[in-house]
Amino acid sequence: MTRVKRGSVARKRRKNILKLASGFQGAHSTIFRTGNQQIIKALASSYRDRGKRKRDFRRLWITRINAAARNNGVSYTKFIRHLYKNQVSSNRKVLAQIAIFDTNSFSTILKKLSSGESIRYRNFSPEFYSGEVRTP
């Protein structure tokens, strides 16, 4: 049986792995074995954290909505219950943005929901829809 020479293939593979590890510190960017281990670890972490980022943002939005709702004397759970009861379809990201950047509109939403009125978006303050982004 003839000998299979694959030095060029192996060199190319190692070179590509080390290119992926080019920004790593110390031996992780120069030695193939440690670099390969760090690449595997980095890819696993990025895969895991893509799902974690979604959970973290949802938790942040819920915290912001809860804080804004409690400033108006309503708990988060009661606020969400009123949303579902009045069939308002709005996600937590949008509600958190309204709570931060337009507190008057958020207060109006809370009052209308707790009183049982239907919500019409034209009743919100015009600054919110003018395109200006105010920082708190």
Swiss-Prot record:
GO terms for cellular component: chloroplast; ribonucleoprotein complex; ribosome. Signal peptide: none annotated. SUPFAM superfamilies: Ribosomal protein L20 (SSF74731). GO terms for molecular function: rRNA binding; structural constituent of ribosome. InterPro entries: Ribosomal_bL20, RIBOSOMAL_L20_CS, Ribosomal_protein_bL20_C. Coiled coil: none annotated. Keywords: Chloroplast, Plastid, Ribonucleoprotein, Ribosomal protein, RNA-binding, rRNA-binding. GO terms for biological process: ribosomal large subunit assembly; translation. The keyword Plastid applies. The keyword Ribosomal protein applies. It holds the Pfam family Ribosomal_L20. It is found in: Plastid, Chloroplast. Its main location: plastid. Gene3D superfamilies: 6.10.160.10, Ribosomal protein L20. Binds directly to 23S ribosomal RNA and is necessary for the in vitro assembly process of the 50S ribosomal subunit. It is not involved in the protein synthesizing functions of that subunit. Belongs to the bacterial ribosomal protein bL20 family. This is Large ribosomal subunit protein bL20c. The gene is rpl20.
